[in-house]
Structure formats: structure tokens, C-alpha cells
Amino acid sequence: MRVTFYTLGCKVNQNETGALAQLFEENGYTVVSNEEGADVYIVNSCTVTNFGDQKSRKWLRRAKRENPGAVTVLTGCYPQAFPDEAAEIAEADVVTGSGNRHAILTDVQKVLNGEEERVVDIRPHEKGERFEELPMDKFAEHTRAFVKVEDGCNRRCAYCVIPRARGPVRSRDEASVLEELCRLADAGYKEVVLTAISLPSYGTDSGTSLVELIEKAAEVPGIERIRLGSLDPDMLHDDDIRRMAAVKKLCPQFHLSLQSGCDKTLRAMRRPYTTAQYADIAAKLRAAFGADNVSFTTDVIVGFPGETEDDFEASMAFVTGMRFLKVHVFPYSRREGTAAYDFADQLPEHEKETRSRRMTAAVEEVRAAEAAAMQGRKASVLLETPLSATMFTGYTKQYLPVLVSAPGHKTGDIVEVTLGAWDGKRCRAEIV
């Protein structure tokens, strides 16, 4: 039996798809690419935006059109957040949510064996439920491993449907995380990324903390780099920063979730910080890790309900002033079930798209300038994608993309380089 996966959304989704692929392989399935014909098509959905829902439906229709006899599966955040809507999608033979992922295998088998014509198995998340273990030790990149350590979110930001899609905070057992890190190190992975739905919430439900986990992860032999997923700035405290700076394996690249650079919009979004507080946290991280050593990335929403042209200009001024190395810009997507869905002053789609283009152009200028400022500096690069026998792409600790000629080296090696010119996509570099 052949199975293929189509994944939308965040690194957590990608991690879960990898774990599901491993589960199916261990039960006799062959995982194939989307271009190949399969007996089972699985869509791991994202519902952050309406566009994500549309893409999930489109891919299911395509799968049924190309292979009418195949079993199609819709799983993840979309059915969890909107179960009635997802259950009505005729092209999906199996519909499951963001929990109880192990049951997908059984549900698929029921349809394949003719025991059930269709299975809808969306279970609501409950307070007190435990983190669902989905072990994974094989990654497509073969160099960087993503390790899921937490699920769920207890916040209620006005624009966000994720708490509805993912349920409450559930932390993975620390021993389980460390065991997986040991397996990954034994398999040759040198860099791990700790991922989660709400990473700073790790341990808040189990009496530990993210910083403790980072410190213990750094003790795993063979793991040379630890990178963090998205962080909420208000959940980083002075002692956390001090302890993190003492962990030499921790990459000094921080994805600090911003969403808007306008205080009025942040209040409307129900984000629990101001731009001044955000800038203060960033300044403390720069001081702790070294201003020339640290980098920041973030997410920004434009076109939120009530955002005026002045608000947008204020947001753009703050965002460009922060000198982010990379910014993911999103036009606001109106999601049913969120507070902002009912807000007045919804902006027209064309205005949101225009602001998205303007913000993107501005942050790309900053990205190029920040990369150019690094020219001549020394950096360590993890070699990831071979373009030829000697040419590789990879990333510095600061997550700067690099192109380097490295004869005698292989994927997964960490090499010391001197950074050169920025070509619009990456820095060219030379081995020291």
C-alpha cells in the first residue's frame, strides 16, 4: 500500500506529518511523493487562514479526481476548529481532528477493508488531557530535526482560531523529549529545533519550564545546536534570558511574535504587550547574546479590523526599525469563532493585499541591509542542501541562509566561513 501526505501550515504540522509517515511505514505502507499515485492520500490541514481551508479542499478534490478509488483523509486543525463544515466535505473518506492521531491508521484500514464506507472521528480537546506522543526519528532534511515539545494554547487573541483548533496547553514529558534527542544525536543530527504551538508555555502545566528543558537538552552529547520555535515576548523574563545566554549550544536567533507594530492594533488584537515592552525584551536579548551575534524574526498581520492608514504606517515604522532578519507578513484573515470576526471596520481584501505588499517590500529592504552588514564576519554554517559535489546551502546560527563551496565536506557538517555578499536570497561565503 502506498500513502502520500500533503502538509499545510507550521513546523508543528510538518513534524506531525513526519511522525504519521513513520507510523504508516512501520505498519507496512510505502510513503510516496504527491506526484506519484497512492492508495491513501492524507491532508494535514492548517486553518490559520481561509486560504488554508481552501487549499485543503482543493487538494482533496484533486486526489479524488486523479485516483477515485483511493482513500482520502482530512486531518488536523481545520476539522478540529470547524468539525461540521469538515464533515460535509464529500471528497474526504476519513475526517479526524488534531488529537488522537494514532487512530488515523485504524480509521484508514476500516475504509480500505470495507468495514466502514466513511469515518468521521473528530474528538474534542478536554481540559487535563495529556500530550499525545508521536515519536519521530527520520527527517527529510537529514540535518535539522524538529522536536515537538508542547501542544495547545491557553490564550485568546482576538484574531486567532488556534486555541479552538489545538485545545489547552499540554507539555510533553521532559524525559520523553530527552530520549528523542538522544536518538536523534545517535542518528547523526547536529541541530534540533524545539517546536510547539505555544513554546514558552512548556512546563506551565507540569511544574517545569522551557529554560530547564533547554539546559538539559544542551547536555545531550552530539547535539551541537538548539534552535527555538516562536516565542511570545511577554513570557520571556530576565532570569530566563540570563540562563538562556549561558547555554552555548542555543542559537541566538529568536522568533519573537509581534503581529503589529501599532499599540492601538495590539490592544484590539488582545496581545498582552506594547511595542515599548516588545522592544525592551529584544534589547535585553541583544545585551545578553551580543548585539552583533543575535538576530530576530517575527510575524506581522496587516489589515486587522479598524487598522487605519496611520496605524499601518506606525506598524511599518516600528517593524522596520526593529531590523528583523526575516518577517512573515500576513493579510488579516477573518476566522469564524474568533472575537475579531464580529469586529466593525473590516477592511476590504484589496486593501489588505496592498498593505501586505507594502510591508513585505519594506521588510525585504531591511533583510538585505541586515545581511549586507554581516559581510566580512566569521560564522559557523550547517551544510544542508548539496547543489553539486562541492557547493552547499546552509544556515548560520542566526538563521542567515548561506551558499558556500565546501570541497571535502558533506551534508550535516558544520563549517566555519567568512560571510560575503548578499545575492537577494542568501549570503555567499568562503570556508575559513
List the predicted regions and their residue ranges.
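Conserved glycine-rich "GG(E/T)P / GGGxP" loop and the immediately following alpha-helix
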Residues: 47-52, 189-216, 220, 232-239, ...
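Conserved strand-turn element in the central/C-terminal portion of the radical SAM core barrel
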Residues: 160-167, 225-234, 260-270, 291-311, ...
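Radical SAM/AdoMet-radical enzyme domain recognition
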Residues: 186, 211-212, 216-220, 225, ...
